[in-house]
Amino acid sequence: VNERPALGLIVVAAAGFLGIVFDINSVFGFAAESFLTIERSSIVTTDDGDGDGGELTAELDVEGVQIPTNGTHGAFGYGMITDDGDETILVAHTHAGLLDSEAQRFIEDPNWHNHFVKFGDVEHCGEDQGIVDITWQSPGEVGIDDNIVRISDVPTGEIEGQHSSMTGESLSFTLGEAVSDVISFKLDSVFGDDGLEAVCVTDIRSAEEVVNLD
C-alpha cells in the first residue's frame, strides 16, 4: 500500500495532532463523547442530469445536547461512505492546532470544515485505517446547531483537488450518490524516531439509522 500521501498530510499536521489527541479527560470521557453516537442521519442527493453528478445534503442528529465547536475535545468528525464513488469519503471534522483546510483562518482555528478523503491500510495504524489522501479544499458547507450537523452543497461528481500538504499535488475525487454508511470517528497520531509517521482513523462508529430521502 502506498503510504506517501499520508506522510504529505503529516508534515502539516504534526504539531496539531501532538497537542490535541489527548485533551479529553479520561474520567469524563464517556459522557463527553456522546456526540460520537449518531442517532439518525438523513441524506438527500440531487442530480442535474448533465452527467457531471449532483449535490449531497445531509443532516445528522447525535446523542447529547451539544457538539463541541471550540477544539477542546480533540480531533473528531463525521463521514459519509458511498457505494458508487471511487472510495472517496466525505468527512466533516474539527481540530485545533493544525492547518489543513482553506476554511481555517489560522492554525489554532477549530472551525468545522469538510474534506474529501481516502482511507487505506497504513502499517503504523495496525488494524485501524489511516488517511492516505485528503483535500485542501473544503467541498460544500457544514454547520453545527446544538446536537445537529448540517452539510450541504457537496458535489457528488468528479472534482479535482489539491493535497492538503500544499505540495501542489493534484488529486481527483468522486464521492458518488449512493450513501451506504454514515460514521463518526476520532483521529490519532503515530510517532516514531523520525517524528509523526501516520494519522489513523479510530473509534469508527456507524449511525444507528441512515435514511436516504431521494
Labelled PLM ranges:
Residues A32-T46, G51-L56, E123, M166-G168, ...:
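A broad structural signal for short, well-ordered beta-strand segments within beta-sheet-rich domains
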Residues E160-D214:
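Acidic/polar low-complexity flexible segments
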Residues L36-G120:
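Surface-exposed, glycine/proline- and aromatic-rich loop segments on solvent-exposed faces
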Residues T94-H95, D109-G130, D145, T167-E169, ...:
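Mature secreted bioactive peptide module from preproproteins
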Residues G29-A31, F116:
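Boundary at the C-terminal end of the N-terminal hydrophobic targeting segment
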